[in-house]
Amino acid sequence: MTGCPFGARPPEAQAEAPTDALKGESPTPGGRLSRRGLFGIAGLGGAAAGLAAGFLGHDAVAASAAPAPDGDSPVVPFHGDHQAGITTPAQDRLHIAAFDVTTTKREELIQLLKDWTQAAEALTEGRPAGATGAVDGPYGAPPEDTGEALDLNAGKLTLTFGFGAGLFEQDGVARFGLDGRRPEALIDLPHFPGDDLDPARSGGDLVVQACADDPQVAVHAIRNLARIGFGKVRVRWSQLGFGRTSSTSRAQHTPRNLFGFKDGTANLKVEDERLLDQHVWARASRPEDAWMAGGSYLVARRIRMHIETWDRTSLGEQEGLIGRTKGTGAPLSGGEEFTEPDFNRQGKGGKPLIPLDSHVRMAHPTQNNGVRMLRRGYNYTDGSDGVGHLDAGLFFIAFVTDPRTHYVPMQMAMAKGDTLAVEYLKHTGSGLFAVPGGAKPGGFIGDGLFA
């Protein structure tokens, strides 16, 4: 919930849902191509090969922005000016993992990024990792793909890669020849009031965000990238997420979080190109940061909700803490879900209808110098703790142009004055990563950093 722009703005005209781009043969239910089916098409010539190319590549304009798939197509293009998985319509499932780089050799790190790029190109198209996949390699060697997604399609998988501060330096010493290349905006996040961070759930040199509509597809992707990185990286932390807590397109409905409220009503959308340029895409403040063109900064926060306490809170108090009705998501000042909150409207006794310490007021752009962010978080649950309380909450993910202006001030204010954040939430994990622009065909993730 923290950092969530609950304060809604009136929506522009609802964009029509994208039309179907692929109709026809499918060896899987629902009219979608399986991984084996894609290989079959790839092996054909002439018109069939052209169909496969159109299915996998889309047109050049669409690919340049790494957009969502057309209609029911399970493939999201990997290449583009921006990485997929940022403005892509949010999928249903998440598996995100941070890695520590264990190799000390620059050439091995570069080769890993090339190998990851090659694997990501295959996985996001619904193909196995490696030349021989899960079953076509030699019996005396481990398979190049783990195989649990053999019978599944791409599932709208996106893989988004980022670099943490630890990639650039460790204990004050530059790593991998990257002295002076750490972006100024890639700061060490400050300690916020109420933080109870677990170091084992925080930080990391590299991060990979895998989002898909099928959880097995997302897990398969992270598992295979970790396998490819064996000996060069090790997993520092990972998190599974379900039930997106924001929409990134006007074609999507507003989801609910584990408090039962609609979440992310005023989130930035892919249709808001001007606002994305202003609030999401990074701007290089110096020549050394030119490799971040088309990129962004990923803020990750694991936020545990005090579920049992919340469940004993009255409906009226819950709505006052949020500043919205639980049913429709309308602001307490009146209207519908997308009605702009009226923070000056008063009720009986002259009290504001939207409380001064409510989440919607504290997170609203008018209270934060007009700052917006693109949220892409997910609900999570990790069983229960030792006293029988659910370990559940929000895995908060936001993409911003600069965390110094677009995350830290808002989070600091909310950690001090948002009663919801103070009494019902606990931050247990944290990370900040520089997400470079999209990889071009023939290139690799973050290649500009190593040029």
Predicted regions and their residues:
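Long, histidine/aromatic-enriched segments associated with O2/redox biology
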Residues: G3-A8, R32, G37-L56, A63-A451
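Compositionally biased low-complexity segments, especially N-terminal hydrophobic helices
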Residues: Q14-E16, H58-V61
